Amino acid sequence: MDVAEFQQWVNDYYDNRGWSELDIFIRIGFLAEETGEVARAIRALEIGRDRPDEATESFEENRQELVEELGDVLGNVMVIANKYNISLEEVFHSHKRKLSERYSEE
């Protein structure tokens, strides 16, 4: 599945559940929440959680958690992009161009 197909799948999936209709500021809150969960997953991978009320997970379990949380972030980014009719391909090209212009080698 390429990026455009995945973006369309996310759009359809969220639409079918009515999740795309949420106010954009609620969606931004979800994105912030998921970003925090990415930070927590990275902490578990890098330094551990060291909490007596949580079981210690293996590296692979922690890595899989990070994969899932990155997916949640990406899903929220796609919903926001879809709301404003922005393809991820457009985002990729724009970001690449911005970085290339800003940090071009002389």
What are these regions (language model features)?
Residues M1-L70, L74-E106:
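Flexible "arm" and connector segments at domain edges
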